[in-house]
């Protein structure tokens, strides 16, 4: 990815810049999200929000996550050429992450991910005033993961029934259900 003139350091409230697999992630605190989003849109040309994702990192790195299937000692059975030894994934700063996938298409097409972290119940501001396409994405993050989004114009469930209890994509969501009778069963 092409770094803008002057580097990413000009993004307001920037806490960290991560480069992995040719992708750039800009990490900001929730209170700096809107300023960073407006700067990326207005000054750096990231006018297109392609996706918003919410991720629950409960239990990281204790569980097999993101291809890591191993033990606390670092043995990963997915890496036979390295005798199954790999460093443990880095601890995450908080339980939940919101990722905003942005695209600049005007002069030189490029992508960047804007990321913010929060604990359970800690709100994140809505980016709908910056990118109106975030509307349904943020509703999905609320509905499926339980992210509290301040200032959203219509924060109601979008996928689950209105009377559904809980948020199904959370790692602590109870598994199980009710038995279902299929036709032909006695």
List PLM regions with ranges.
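Terminal low-complexity/charged segments
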Residues: 1-186
């Amino acid at each position: 990815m092409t770094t803008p003139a002057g580097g990413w350091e000009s993004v307001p409230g920037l806490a960290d810049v991560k480069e992995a697999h040719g992708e750039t992630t800009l990490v900001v605190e929730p209170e700096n999200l809107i300023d960073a989003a407006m700067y990326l849109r207005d000054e750096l040309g990231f006018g297109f929000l392609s996706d918003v994702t919410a991720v629950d990192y409960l239990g990281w790195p204790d569980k097999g996550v993101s291809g890591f299937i191993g033990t606390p000692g670092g043995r990963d059975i997915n890496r036979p050429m390295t005798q199954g030894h790999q460093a443990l994934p880095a601890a995450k700063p908080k339980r939940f992450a919101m990722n905003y996938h942005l695209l600049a298409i005007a002069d030189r097409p490029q992508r960047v991910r804007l990321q913010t972290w929060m604990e359970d119940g800690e709100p994140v501001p809505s980016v709908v005033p910056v990118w109106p396409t975030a509307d349904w994405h943020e509703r999905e993050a609320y509905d499926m993961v339980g992210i509290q989004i301040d200032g959203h114009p219509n924060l109601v469930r979008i996928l689950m029934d209105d009377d559904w209890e809980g948020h199904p994509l959370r790692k602590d969501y109870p598994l199980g259900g009710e038995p279902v009778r299929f036709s032909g069963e006695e």
